[in-house]
Amino acid sequence: MAPMDLSELKNRVSQAVDQMKDELVSISLDIHRNPELAFNEYKAAGWLSGFMEKQGFKVSRNVAGMETDFAAEFQSGEGGPTIAILGEYDALPEVGHACGHNIIGTSAVGAGAALKKALEGSGVNAKVLVLGTPAEEGGGG
C-alpha cells in the first residue's frame, strides 16, 4: 500500500482533534483548577498519561527519575522517523497556570493522539512519542 499523502494526513489530524475536543478541554480545565508546583504534578501527570493510555499509547512513568514524568509511545508500521512532542504541566507559586502550562500539556497529548489516529491505516511508518515534562518552571522538565 502506498503511504497516504500529506494533505489527507492533515485532514485526519484535524478531524481527530475535533472528535477529542471536549475531553481535551475538560482535562485542561481540570489541570487549571488544580495547580501543582514543580515535581508535584501528580494529578496533572495522571490525567495526561491516563488520556494517552486510553488512546492506545504504551505509557511509561518515572522514565527520567521523576515521579511525575511520563513517555507515551505509538509505532505506526516499522521504522520511520520519531515525532516527539513535549508537554509541560506545572504551575507557578501564587499565580497557578498564568503561563498556560495546563494548555501546553493538554495540547501535547491531544496532538500526539490526533497524530496516532491519522497514522493508523495510513501506510506511513513513524513513531509518535509524547513526553510529559514536569517542573519546567522549577528546574526540571
Task: Cite the ranges covered by each PLM segment.
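Fold-level recognition of mixed alpha/beta catalytic cores in primary-metabolism enzymes, strongest
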Residues: 123-141
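Acidic/His- and Gly-rich active-site-bordering loop/insert found
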Residues: 3-129
